[in-house]
Amino acid sequence: MDTRAQQSPSIGNLPLARRWRSQMWRLLFASLAAAALVNPFVYSPAAAAEPCPDVQVVFARGTFEPPGVGVTGQAFVDALRADLPNKSVDVYAVDYPASLDFARAADGVADARNKVQDVANKCPKTKMVLSGYSQGAAVMAYITTDNVPPNFELPAGITGPMPKSIAGHVAALTLFGKPSTGFLNMLDTNAPPITIGREYGSKALDLCADNDPVCSAGGGGDPAAHGMYAVNGMTQQAAGFATQHV
């Protein structure tokens, strides 16, 4: 009988995929901590404007942010309203967990799709601006997708891509810190690729801060960069882009 004491596995002994995930979570927590330092207050979307506003923002917050549009979302909405003083701008915060369980992003995809299609049907003259931060950027990109990857089973509540006619009601798509392919694979190896549909490409702005490890193709090297979109000028840039399209 082997009586030698067993050592607890260290990070260096874990399989490569698990080490990557461990590193990814450390980066994510560091990024979120940086975002909290930028603005520690909890933001909530403003009260709904008129039943059919001139502009409808649909925003999905990032991982761990409390319900609402989050820090980046509020900065974007504030900038957009400042750019459109003569238009009514309503805001809808996508309802989903925004948790470490990336598979639950599908809840956000279903909720955002339902909202977008509802606005298109009930308020055909309203211009929509779709936007999201981090995991929320993935959610909003997913709702624009053209097709379902082969052998991918659609989650409950999602029947397939939105009708192409919906794209005509969407003025702009602005994304902040959308997970790169490499980062997505660390989050969930079963997640479908994050792609922007062809109908939305010309009206999309996909922003990634320098050295942001979540969205940079090479991984980046500054976790704090992922939490700085509210103050690095990119929310104003995105608002200006959306303003030109509504």
Q: Which role fits each region the language model picked out?
A:
Residues A34-P40, Y142, Q236-A239:
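Hydrophobic alpha-helical membrane segments, chiefly transmembrane helices and signal peptide h-regions
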Residues V109-R198:
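Serine-dependent carboxylesterase/thioesterase catalytic core
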Residues P51-K127, L207-T235, A239-Q244:
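Active-site catalytic motif of lipid deacylating hydrolases and related acyltransferases
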Residues K164-Q244:
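The alpha/beta-hydrolase serine catalytic core
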Residues M1-A48:
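Secretory targeting and sorting signals
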